[in-house]
């Protein structure tokens, strides 16, 4: 599962693997008080007893990032970061999935953000997507593309939950 939360002019927080539905809003509150994403992540690490089971990504409106992949998330799990972005995943075919996603995002700078994000998800799927530990392919069950402006309303909010072909 996953839980993205975005606040215009402030930033975005996404939690996945073992999701705490309150974590996104708990992370945005201190950011609203001036905490950096790294400081927020440190606070979450201390306050959340299940933190090692989660993946958490934070991107501020200024493109400052912090990311965590817990040591108890289901393999293959990891994350990569780039200039103002994070790609992260769990139960993946391997690191190559994240590498393909990062490359797709970086190569499409001239494309609208929503299309760029969709292309990034498709690149991950095409690179092997999700898989069991023995390499058996799993269909992506959920996906989201959410973009936000400076105001408190979204531009795009596309979500697919509990589907056999979430990225298709």
What are these regions (language model features)?
Residues 1-168:
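N-terminal nucleophile
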């Amino acid at each position: 599962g996953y839980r993205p939360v975005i606040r215009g002019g402030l930033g975005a927080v996404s939690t996945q693997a073992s999701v705490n539905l309150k974590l996104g809003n708990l992370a945005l509150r201190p950011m609203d008080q001036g905490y950096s994403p790294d400081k927020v992540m440190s606070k979450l690490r201390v306050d959340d007893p299940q933190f090692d089971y989660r993946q958490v990504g934070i991107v501020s409106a200024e493109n400052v990032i912090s990311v965590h992949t817990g040591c108890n998330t289901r393999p293959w799990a990891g994350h990569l970061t780039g200039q103002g972005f994070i790609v992260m995943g769990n139960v993946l075919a391997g690191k190559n999935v994240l590498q393909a996603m990062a490359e797709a995002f970086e190569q499409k700078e001239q494309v609208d953000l929503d299309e760029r994000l969709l292309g990034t998800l498709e690149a991950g799927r095409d690179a092997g997507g999700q898989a069991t530990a023995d390499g058996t392919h799993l269909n992506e069950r959920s996906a989201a593309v959410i973009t936000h402006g400076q105001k408190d309303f979204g531009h795009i909010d596309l979500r697919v939950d509990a589907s056999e072909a979430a990225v298709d």
